[in-house]
Amino acid sequence: MHRITILGATGSIGESTLDVIRRHPGRYAAHALSAHRQVRKLADQCIEFRPARAVVGTAEAARELETLLRDASVATEVSYGEAALESIAADAQTDAVMAAIVGAAGLRPTLAAARAGKRVLLANKEALVMSGRIFMDAVREHGATLLPIDSEHNAIFQCLPADDPRYGRGVAKVLLTASGGPFRTRDPATLHDISPDQACAHPNWVMGRKISVDSATMMNKGLEVIEAHWLFGAPAERIEVLIHPQSIVHSMVAYTDGSVLAQLGNPDMRTPIAYGLAYPERIDAGVTPLDLTLAGGLHFEKPDLARFPCLGLAFDALRAAGVAPAVLNAANEVGVEAFLAGQVRFTDIAGIVRQVLEEAPSGPADTLEAVLAADALAREAARAGVTARAAAR
């Protein structure tokens, strides 16, 4: 029996992970689950899966969860806070950790899992975007196994040489595909009128609201470019983004002999989740098999950086190196949060990120303290940008 900790169990990745676990009751068990605010959903998950431990964000949420579980006669141990998250990530009874907390909040527990030598199923982008070198060093030094769960990086992992899935050895280029989001063909002059609900209506994938907005701005793909650099050792000039509206080709690897290997499948996150859970084996994920005769044509185009300036900003941050990717991520999180709250326009997100990137001090990302300090300064600057733009509306 493989015991799984899920950081971010009530989000879309967490729920999909539990669905795969549910399909294989003799193979996997949920050992620990975490959520921030969705206490009732977490309680329902604990009642069904009976984890040994559960973690929430606050003492108040912990009291509520304890009451719900006590009434259901469920003996799950409840705790709260950042230290508790790190504890379940490094728990000696856990075989694998699904790192699915969205945003910078997932950084410390994901790093704790790596330092504990766990099999880390990485769905959290920020661990690599903010502190790529620190995180990859921890994976190597502590013997952790790192398996990417983002559909694109999981596809690249499958297309690279199995014994050493990294750039080199005949690899010419890494090709990340992107759907283009809901505004791929919309007149750029009308993008300032986009509502949060429109931005969250992804044409192919079911995702949380923050990631849906990132997909609409293509910042999501920009963060994935930075991830690909750290995961596979590919330099920025060897990472290319292609718009692929059908979301069937999840990514590709081009080789120096002219070969291009691609991973295809229906757009369902249970496929890469099942791959990560069972690696190097394969298990049923509950996903409808791909029928290419029904899929029709597969189309590809280059992204328009005028329409999607966030993608260009991410490449800029990767080339700048140091704390620049952490600054990019922090400013974007603040901008997206403000947009979802109705404080700024959709098109203000890129402007906030650009301004913070231009004004933030540079420096090496050689310690976690340096990364978190840069993150804090960037958030403060981004909030000032939000205030200025909100006042000007």
From Swiss-Prot:
The keyword NADP applies. The keyword NADP applies. NADPH binds at residues 10-13, 37-38, 124, 126, 208. Disulfide bonds: none annotated. Its cofactor is Mg(2+); Mn(2+). It is an enzyme of class 1 (oxidoreductase). GO terms for molecular function: 1-deoxy-D-xylulose-5-phosphate reductoisomerase activity; manganese ion binding; NADPH binding. It catalyses: 2-C-methyl-D-erythritol 4-phosphate + NADP(+) = 1-deoxy-D-xylulose 5-phosphate + NADPH + H(+). 1-deoxy-D-xylulose 5-phosphate binds at residues 125, 151-152, 179, 202, 215, 220-221, 224. Mn(2+) binds at residues 150, 152, 224. GO terms for biological process: isopentenyl diphosphate biosynthetic process, methylerythritol 4-phosphate pathway involved in terpenoid biosynthetic process. Pathway: Isoprenoid biosynthesis; isopentenyl diphosphate biosynthesis via DXP pathway; isopentenyl diphosphate from 1-deoxy-D-xylulose 5-phosphate: step 1/6. Belongs to the DXR family. NCBIfam families: Dxr, PRK05447.1-1, PRK12464.1. HAMAP family: DXP_reductoisom. This is 1-deoxy-D-xylulose 5-phosphate reductoisomerase. It comes from Cupriavidus taiwanensis (strain DSM 17343 / BCRC 17206 / CCUG 44338 / CIP 107171 / LMG 19424 / R1) (Ralstonia taiwanensis (strain LMG 19424)). The gene is dxr.
